[in-house]
């Protein structure tokens, strides 16, 4: 798992790891609560997990785990379906090694930890109309057009399960039925939390994510750069500068 500043895979796994233990950056009122026994326990778990990692994860970005898995350097990582899709595409062109990887691999949902409920963090790509738009109604009409079944179903199929849907009706899309290795992915929109965790969704949550507050805290412990206490203290100070 990436310990470098991997905005997708790195942020995804550390948020799951922390949330699954009951650790949160802020509470429902956006008050910083990262300095907690749950965070300390989560960091102990992350450190133990990182001791099993291959060398180099401290500098991994979002591409490194794909490469490592496809080259059989690792047998477990967190990702969307891009690794599987790459192996499948290469296998279709006659790559025997890629076919071996494709046939042998599978996907799983994130485990539920002591928190007792799914605490996954999947990346959301929002559709937004900016206030400065000169044609807001046209933008809204396009969004409505895109989400109509005759348009969205085709788009969803072409995304080959890399992207999932926010509307229940699209559970019936063929992409979730044609390949058993992709079927469980249709539920990720139901299972994911937002970047704010317990807190609100907005600029502050986005800033904490962009500044890698949680990821850097985990990485500093896993790499031995900081003790658990010191790492939590740094994250707490960073968070309080953002949430004020």
What are these language model-derived features?
Residues 29-58, 106, 110:
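Glycine-centered hinge/linker elements that transmit conformational signals in sensory
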Residues 57-71:
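Short helix-initiation/N-cap motifs at beta->coil->alpha
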Residues 62, 79-84, 125:
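Beta->alpha turn/N-cap motifs
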Residues 71-80:
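Alpha-to-beta junction loops
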Residues 81-99:
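A ligand-binding cleft/hinge motif common to bilobed small-molecule-binding domains
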Residues 103-109, 157-213, 218-220:
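Long, aromatic- and glycine/proline-rich binding clefts that accommodate carbohydrate-like moieties
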């Amino acid at each position: 798992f990436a310990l470098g500043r991997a905005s997708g895979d790195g942020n995804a796994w550390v948020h799951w790891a922390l949330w699954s233990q009951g650790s949160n950056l802020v509470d429902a009122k956006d008050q910083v609560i990262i300095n907690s026994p749950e965070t300390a326990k989560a960091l102990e778990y992350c450190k133990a997990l990182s001791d099993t990692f291959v060398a180099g994860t401290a500098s991994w970005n979002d591409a490194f785990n794909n490469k490592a898995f496809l080259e059989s350097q690792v047998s477990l990582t967190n990702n969307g379906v891009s690794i599987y899709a790459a192996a499948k595409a290469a296998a279709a062109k006659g790559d025997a090694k890629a076919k071996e990887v494709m046939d042998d691999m599978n996907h799983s949902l994130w485990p539920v930890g002591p928190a007792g409920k799914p605490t996954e963090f999947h990346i959301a790509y929002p559709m937004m109309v900016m206030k400065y738009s000169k044609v807001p109604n046209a933008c809204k009409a396009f969004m409505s057009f895109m989400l109509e079944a005759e348009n969205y179903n085709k788009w969803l199929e072409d995304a080959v399960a890399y992207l999932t849907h926010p509307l229940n009706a699209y559970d019936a899309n063929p992409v979730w039925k044609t390949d058993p290795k992709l079927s469980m992915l249709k539920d990720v929109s139901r299972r994911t939390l937002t970047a704010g965790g317990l807190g609100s969704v907005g600029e502050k949550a986005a800033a904490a994510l962009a500044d890698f507050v949680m990821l850097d805290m985990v990485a500093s412990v896993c790499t031995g750069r900081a003790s658990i206490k010191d790492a939590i203290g740094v994250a707490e100070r960073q968070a309080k500068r953002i949430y004020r």
